Each structure stands twice: as structure tokens, then as C-alpha cells.
């Protein structure tokens, strides 16, 4: 029997884009990367675990902020190269800027406009030096 992780088309760095979507509202919350270990742990722990390219390590979403993403469903696209995580966003904040979603800017007439409010000051979310 083929391992379900072998069905993923990983990029040349061994990563796959992972989109977190609110399971109730359908809103796209964020996009991050997963390696094989992150995806396997996400499935087994029922919470979003990503691969931080900048830190070069696993990143358990909410480990510092408390804004955990509880996994309800994993979906794989038709080309097997993008994952969607249907999640419950604990605390209502997915973005490190303190907003509900990382997609808080809208293109309007040749520029980007911020349309979503900061729900919590990032300095109040993350420890000093983050």
C-alpha cells in the first residue's frame, strides 16, 4: 500500500504550499509551507504544524501566540501540489500582524489598501525579541 505522503508532489526543496482556511466561514487565513514531517505531524496531532523556511525548523502554529489552528480536514488539490487545511482558528487571529487573516490587503486602483483591522497588537501577542 502506498504511503499517503508519497502522493504529494513536493517541490525541489521538499516542501508543499499549505493554505489554512476557516472551516466555518471559508475565509482563507494564511499560506505557509510544510515538509513531509510537518504534514505527517499535522495529521497525527490534529493541529497545524508548518515548516519555517526562515528559522529552518518545524513551527507549531500558536506555540508562542496561543493562536492554534485545530485541524478538521486536510485536502489535496488535483495536481497533488497544494494542501488545504480546514481549521478552527483558536483566538480568531491567524496573522502575525494581529489580524484574522494574512490576506488583509485589497488591490484598488494601482495600490494595496489595508481593509482588515488589527485585532490585537503583535507586541502583546509575542514575547520581546520575536
From Swiss-Prot:
GO terms for cellular component: cytoplasm. Its EC number is 3.5.4.19. The lineage of its organism: Bacteria, Pseudomonadati, Pseudomonadota, Gammaproteobacteria, Pseudomonadales. One of its GO terms (molecular function) is phosphoribosyl-AMP cyclohydrolase activity. Homodimer. This is Phosphoribosyl-AMP cyclohydrolase. It comes from Pseudomonas syringae pv. tomato (strain ATCC BAA-871 / DC3000). It catalyses: 1-(5-phospho-beta-D-ribosyl)-5'-AMP + H2O = 1-(5-phospho-beta-D-ribosyl)-5-[(5-phospho-beta-D-ribosylamino)methylideneamino]imidazole-4-carboxamide. Catalyzes the hydrolysis of the adenine ring of phosphoribosyl-AMP. It is found in: Cytoplasm. Pathway: Amino-acid biosynthesis; L-histidine biosynthesis; L-histidine from 5-phospho-alpha-D-ribose 1-diphosphate: step 3/9. The keyword Metal-binding applies.
